[in-house]
Design a protein with these regions (language model features):
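Intrinsic disorder at enzyme termini
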Residues: 1-18
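A non-catalytic, amphipathic alpha-helix used as a structural packing/dimerization or gating element
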Residues: 14-29
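Glycine-rich flavin
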Residues: 32-126
């Protein structure tokens, strides 16, 4: 188990600590089965990871509430905690989540209304 004393740092709020515990519990329970066939079906494994992250509500952190997200606006601390935890469990899980944000972040911040309507809801859903 890695040192998680950083969760007590003052710029993290109780909601961040709860999120870290929630994603860690979820990752321990789900990631091993989700990545079991990664060498036989990499694309399918990534798709399955994103779907599972969506079903669990974690991809909702990659978009603001206006696009179906969990929070009013993107919260970098939440995104970092999710990525750190997923990466600790399996690099492919972090990759699958990160790719969602690489597209949705710029669209959330700078995309047209049409782009936001087209892309953000599907990302939030996983």
């Amino acid at each position: 188990m890695s040192d998680r004393s950083y969760l007590q740092w003052p710029f993290l709020e109780p909601a961040h600590r709860s999120l870290a515990a929630e994603i860690d519990t979820w990752a321990a329970a789900h990631i091993p089965a989700l990545v079991a066939r990664e060498h036989e079906d990499l694309d399918g494994t990534c798709i399955g990871l994103v779907r599972a992250l969506g079903e669990a509500g974690f991809t909702r952190y990659a978009v603001p509430a206006s696009g179906g997200g969990k929070l009013d606006k993107l919260d970098v601390r939440s995104l970092c905690l999710i990525r750190e935890t997923l990466g600790r469990h399996h690099a492919l899980a972090d990759f699958a989540f990160a790719i969602q944000g690489l597209g949705s972040g710029p669209i959330s911040l700078f995309g047209s209304q049409a782009q936001q309507q087209q892309f953000l809801q599907p990302v939030a859903a996983g």
